[in-house]
Structure formats: structure tokens, C-alpha cells
């Protein structure tokens, strides 16, 4: 197969991140220097983000049978790279206190980013599986990077064992689909699996097993049990990546799969996804109420947010607004999560001490760091879906789409879940403004706003507010980012 210059241009983000991996490897072999390797990583990711401008000039293109680069892929590649940039930025001060090899952290983030880019442009079950494994395997190392701390190692082992089991289900489900359809490409599956075939037991079994595998990766009920433990055990910068880049990339490819293949037309599949959505919304929000650990709380809240997004997946074949809803919601979720986890990272001791994850650590933060507490307030209000924030725009789109698609009980679950979520998000917000305990020692540097992590957090807060008040630029961008069949 001959690759044309246009195809190379379409693969620029993947090629640049791959080249950055090689450069960072050579740099580590030449000399271990934390600052140089972190800088090379950030430069590589920024170049990959800028290269999307040149990718857009090529237009929708099938690069190989495994990859399709169009507006949809470009939008989600951009979100994944932004999440990776934020992760690398938050990790730098955390790694400064790390006693062992620090530079490999950036290698793992870059390799996982390649997996996310591959997933966003995947057009084939083979690239779907490769992308998921490429994003999951580095996470085993990243979650357990603080391996001297028992909980980090425990979280890594938990995630590794359960992820391996989920991958087995996913692979077996793909094999069953291939046995019946004779094709692994999304379009080929769409042509092969006609309406009459979709109800065959083998097809439904294959789809069911794929839902199990993907449900684990997306922390959907009942495959979510690992989520709070892993979020709590992982270092704060890694939790950022886990909550954003991996979820966004996997959800993007699942949306494309359901759009191309008629699996979503099966009433049985739609019913299962609807039940999972309601269970995820209610379980995630109800479990978050009792949490006193901010990372566990955000872990449970991510289960609920993916439940809201499943409603777009249920309606993706029948409703044009579904893709737009997913894009707006995921953009809002990305910036809100980056800000929330960014504040946790800034509040945490560089490696040596525990992360600032207890709600008690945030009590009275306003009286010591008013701007940082204002940022955390904005992020909590956005995740709760309060008007004038980007999170509200996403929730509004979900409810509007649910109503127009006549998914009444799912829309009711969104409203109920949002009402429950309001309680625990406001609980965090209120604690920021209470009187501060005198005994509490804070590790946040006084010049936090001038650090790279502080700048990322402030930009996230500004975007959440500005796009919450005037969302038209984001909506226009999402409308351009539609996959062309």
C-alpha cells in the first residue's frame, strides 16, 4: 500500500507524538534531566495540537482501512491532546519530589496520548482494540508510579487485573461479530449486519460482550467498582488523565461505531444501554453524597457524567443532535475536570506527602488562596450544571435531546441525578468559604498562579465561564466536527 503526502498530512498529530516519544527516549538515554524531558514533551504535544490546522486542509480522508480523519476525529484528537498537556503540566511539580526515575512518566503519557489519537480516528475494530490497549497499558504504570505508596500500587494492580478481564470480553465480542459478519470495519459491519441479522443470538452475544468491555473502560454501572479506588490511589495528575483523555477517546470511538453499524437499532441493545445509563446516573450521584475524599467524589461523579452521555449514544442513530450533544458535553466535562483535578494537584505535596484529597484540606481555602478557591467554585458549579457555566450548556443539550427524541424516563433520570449532584458539589463549594482550622498546613506555593499548572487551571476556569455565557464558538466548532458517512 502506497501512502500519499495527503495521508501523511492527515496523520500529523499521531506522527508528531510518535516522534516525540522517540526524542524523549533518546534524551533520557543521553542524559537524565527532568526539566529538558518535560519541556520536550510539552513542545511535542503543542506541535501536535497546532498540526490539526494542517490536517483540516486535507479534508475527510481514509488514511488506511483502520483510520478515518475527518472533522469528528480532529475535534476529539484536540481534546485528548489538551488533556495530555494538562496532565504533563500538573505532573512536573509533583515529580520534582520523586526520588526515582522521573522522566519515564512523560514517555507513558505520550504513548497513552498516541492511543487516544488512534481511537479518535478509528474506523475499524482492529484500530479500536489497538487504541484501547495503547491507552490502557501505559496507565498501569502511571497509576502505580508512586509505587512506594501502598495505595498507588494497589490501585495499579486492581486496574491492571480488571482491565485485562475487560479486554478479554471486548476481544471475544469482536470475534463473535466477525464470525457472523465477515468484516471488522465499522462500515463493513453496517452493511453486513442487516436488520434481520441483528436479532441473531450470536450477534447479540457479541454486542453484549463488547458492551461489558467498553463499559469497564468508561466506568459504567455495573462495571465501575474500580473507579473510586483507582482515582484515590493514583497520583493527582494521573487521575486527571484517567478522568479526561481516556474517557473522551473511548467514548468518541464508541459513538462512531454505533453511528456506522446498525447495532443501536436493536431494541434489546437500546434497552440495555438505557438501563446502564439510569443505573450509572443514580449510583454515581448517590455514592458521591457520602464521600469525604475529593478524588473519590470526583470518581463517582465521573460515573454519573458518563451515564448522562450514554443518552446521546442511545439516540445517535435516530437523532442528529446526539453527536452535537456529546461534543459540547465532553468539552465542558474536560475543562471542568482539568480545573478540579488541577486544584487538587496544586494543593498536594510534591510526591513526598499525601495528596490534598480530604474535604477537610479545602475548608476555609478562600481566606488563604481566594483566587484558587474561586477557580474550584467555578469547576464545582460547572460539574453541577449551574447556569453561566459550560457544564450547564452540556446538561441543557442532553435534556433538549432527550425531550426531542422522546426518551422521557432517561431525561427524568438526568434531572433527578442533577438535583442529587447539586448537593455534594455545593457541599465542596461551601467548605471553601467556612472558617479555616488553625492547625491546617497548606502546601500550595504562594505564587501558584505563575506556575505552569496554575496557568492551565486559570485558563480552564476562564473557558468554563466564557463558553458558559457565550457558547456559540464551541457549538459552531462541534457542528463542523461531524463524521461524514
Swiss-Prot record:
It is found in: Cell inner membrane. Keywords: Cell inner membrane, Cell membrane, Membrane, NAD, Quinone, Translocase, Transmembrane, Transmembrane helix, Transport, Ubiquinone. The chain crosses the membrane at residues 10-30, 35-55, 75-95, 104-124, 125-145, 159-179, 203-223, 235-255, 271-291, 297-317, 327-347, 374-394, 408-427, 449-469. The keyword Transcription regulation does not apply. The keyword Zinc does not apply. One of its GO terms (biological process) is ATP synthesis coupled electron transport. It is a multi-pass membrane protein. It catalyses: a quinone + NADH + 5 H(+)(in) = a quinol + NAD(+) + 4 H(+)(out). Its main location: membrane. One of its GO terms (cellular component) is plasma membrane. One of its GO terms (molecular function) is NADH:ubiquinone reductase (non-electrogenic) activity. Its EC number is 7.1.1.-. InterPro entries: NADH-Q_OxRdtase_suN/2, ND/Mrp_TM. NDH-1 is composed of 13 different subunits. Subunits NuoA, H, J, K, L, M, N constitute the membrane sector of the complex. NDH-1 shuttles electrons from NADH, via FMN and iron-sulfur (Fe-S) centers, to quinones in the respiratory chain. The immediate electron acceptor for the enzyme in this species is believed to be ubiquinone. Couples the redox reaction to proton translocation (for every two electrons transferred, four hydrogen ions are translocated across the cytoplasmic membrane), and thus conserves the redox energy in a proton gradient. Belongs to the complex I subunit 2 family. HAMAP family: NDH1_NuoN_1. This is NADH-quinone oxidoreductase subunit N. The lineage of its organism: Bacteria, Pseudomonadati, Pseudomonadota, Gammaproteobacteria, Enterobacterales.
Amino acid at each position: 500500500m502506497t501512502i500519499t503526502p495527503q495521508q501523511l498530512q492527515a496523520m500529523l498529530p499521531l506522527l508528531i507524538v510518535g516522534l516525540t516519544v522517540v526524542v524523549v527516549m533518546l534524551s533520557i538515554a543521553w542524559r537524565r534531566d527532568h526539566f529538558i524531558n518535560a519541556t520536550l514533551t510539552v513542545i511535542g504535544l503543542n506541535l501536535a495540537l497546532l498540526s490539526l490546522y494542517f490536517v483540516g486542509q486535507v479534508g475527510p480522508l481514509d488514511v488506511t482501512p483502520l483510520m478515518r480523519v475527518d472533522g469528528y476525529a480532529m475535534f476529539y484528537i484536540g481534546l485528548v491532546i489538551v488533556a495530555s498537556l494538562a496532565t504533563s503540566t500538573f505532573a512536573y511539580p509533583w515529580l520534582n519530589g520523586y526520588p526515582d526515575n522521573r522522566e519515564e512518566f512523560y514517555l507513558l503519557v505520550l504513548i497513552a496520548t498516541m492511543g487516544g489519537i488512534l481511537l479518535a480516528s478509528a474506523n475499524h475494530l482492529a484500530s479500536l482494540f489497538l487504541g484501547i490497549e495503547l491507552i490502557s497499558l501505559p496507565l498501569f504504570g502511571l497509576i502505580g508510579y508512586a509505587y512506594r505508596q501502598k495505595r498507588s500500587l494497589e490501585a495499579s494492580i486492581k486496574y491492571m487485573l480488571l482491565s485485562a478481564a475487560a479486554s478479554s470480553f471486548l476481544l471475544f465480542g469482536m470475534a463473535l461479530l466477525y464470525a457472523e459478519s465477515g468484516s471488522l470495519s465499522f462500515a463493513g459491519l453496517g452493511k453486513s449486519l442487516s436488520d434481520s441479522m441483528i436479532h441473531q443470538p450470536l450477534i447479540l452475544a457479541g454486542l453484549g460482550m463488547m458492551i461489558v468491555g467498553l463499559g469497564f473502560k468508561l466506568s459504567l454501572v455495573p462495571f465501575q467498582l474500580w473507579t473510586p479506588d483507582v482515582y484515590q490511589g493514583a497520583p493527582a495528575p494521573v487521575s486527571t488523565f484517567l478522568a479526561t483523555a481516556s474517557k473522551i477517546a473511548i467514548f468518541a470511538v464508541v459513538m462512531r461505531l454505533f453511528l456506522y453499524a446498525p447495532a443501536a437499532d436493536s431494541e434489546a441493545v437500546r434497552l440495555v444501554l438505557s438501563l446502564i445509563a439510569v443505573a450509572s446516573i443514580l449510583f454515581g450521584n448517590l455514592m458521591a453524597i457520602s464521600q469525604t475524599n475529593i478524588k473519590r467524589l470526583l470518581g463517582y461523579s465521573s460515573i454519573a457524567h458518563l451515564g448522562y452521555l450514554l443518552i446521546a449514544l442511545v439516540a445517535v442513530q435516530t437523532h442528529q443532535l446526539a453527536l452535537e450533544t456529546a461534543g459540547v458535553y465532553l468539552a465542558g466535562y474536560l475543562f471542568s475536570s482539568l480545573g478540579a483535578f488541577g486544584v487538587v494537584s496544586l494543593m498536594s505535596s510534591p510526591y513526598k506527602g499525601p495528596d490534598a484529597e480530604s474535604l477537610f484540606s479545602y475548608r476555609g481555602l478562600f481566606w488563604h488562596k481566594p483566587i484558587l478557591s474561586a477557580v474550584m467554585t467555578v469547576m464545582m458549579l460547572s460539574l453541577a450544571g449551574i447556569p453561566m457555566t459550560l457544564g450547564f450548556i452540556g446538561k441543557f443539550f442532553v435534556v433538549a435531546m432527550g425531550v426531542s427524541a422522546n426518551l422521557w424516563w432517561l431525561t427524568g433520570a438526568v434531572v433527578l441525578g442533577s438535583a442529587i449532584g447539586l448537593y455534594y458539589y455545593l457541599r465542596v463549594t461551601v467548605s471553601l468559604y467556612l472558617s479555616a482550622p488553625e492547625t491546617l498546613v497548606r502546601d500550595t506555593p504562594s505564587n501558584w498562579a505563575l506556575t505552569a499548572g496554575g496557568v492551565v487551571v486559570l485558563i480552564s476556569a476562564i473557558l468554563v465561564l466564557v463558553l458558559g455565557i457565550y457558547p456559540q464558538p464551541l457549538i459552531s466548532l462541534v457542528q463542523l466536527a461531524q463524521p461524514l458517512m
